[in-house]
């Protein structure tokens, strides 16, 4: 909320919008496509069990072997429909602002290698947008929070200008959060 107030003070006009779907709706479509394409790209390495490869990466990539052509094509059609809908919705706006993640950063010791915390950022990839994740404060636990600025395809300059303005207007004490490593 503080970041939004700062952007408003800099002249940004903020509008709450209702999205045509939830960010959670993207999960299954992305999972099918990313798994299938990831496996197709790396199968020569993934299938050779004697090669040294992180077990979590291997397990995630192997999931793509079981994605059917039907599921893959259905997910691609779904993603294309979302792209059209969002491009129409975004015509009136320079950017979409969301948190970068559901939570503050977590200590490295608590990272679950099988969980990809990409609830909001996953949409950026599906919708072929550009985005900038910008640290914007600290949660009650003292760990960093982040704002994600999503922009139109190839509108990196706009997204970077918004991020630069926000960063320059928020002088935050620079500190390294405790307990991350």
Give the role of each language-model region.
Residues 1-10, 67, 73-77, 84, ...:
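Structural helix-boundary/capping segments
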Residues 13-18:
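General small-molecule cofactor/ligand-binding pocket signal
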Residues 28-33, 73-74, 103-122:
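Short, surface-exposed loop/helix-turn segments at secondary-structure junctions
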Residues 32-87, 133-144:
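Short helix-loop capping/hinge segments that flank enzyme active sites or metal/cofactor-binding pockets
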Residues 87, 111-135:
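Small-aliphatic-rich amphipathic alpha-helix that forms the alpha element of a beta-alpha
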Residues 100:
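Glycine-rich, N-terminal phosphate-binding loop of Rossmann-like dinucleotide-binding domains
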């Amino acid at each position: 909320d503080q970041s939004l107030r700062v952007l408003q003070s800099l002249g940004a006009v903020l509008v709450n919008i209702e999205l045509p779907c939830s960010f959670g709706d993207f999960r299954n479509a992305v999972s099918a496509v990313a798994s299938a394409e990831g496996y197709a790209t790396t199968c020569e390495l993934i299938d050779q069990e004697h090669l040294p490869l992180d077990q979590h990466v291997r397990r995630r990539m192997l999931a793509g072997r079981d994605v059917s052509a039907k599921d893959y094509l259905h997910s691609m059609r779904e993603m294309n429909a979302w792209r059209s809908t969002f491009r129409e919705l975004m015509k009136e706006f320079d950017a979409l602002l969301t948190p970068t993640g559901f939570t503050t950063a977590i200590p490295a010791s608590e990272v679950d290698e099988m969980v990809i915390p990409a609830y909001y950022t996953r949409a950026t990839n599906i919708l072929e947008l550009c985005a900038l994740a910008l640290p914007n404060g600290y949660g009650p636990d003292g760990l960093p929070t982040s704002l994600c600025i999503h922009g139109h395809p190839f509108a990196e300059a706009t997204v970077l200008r918004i991020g630069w303005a926000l960063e320059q207007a928020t002088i935050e004490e620079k500190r390294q959060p405790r307990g991350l490593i």
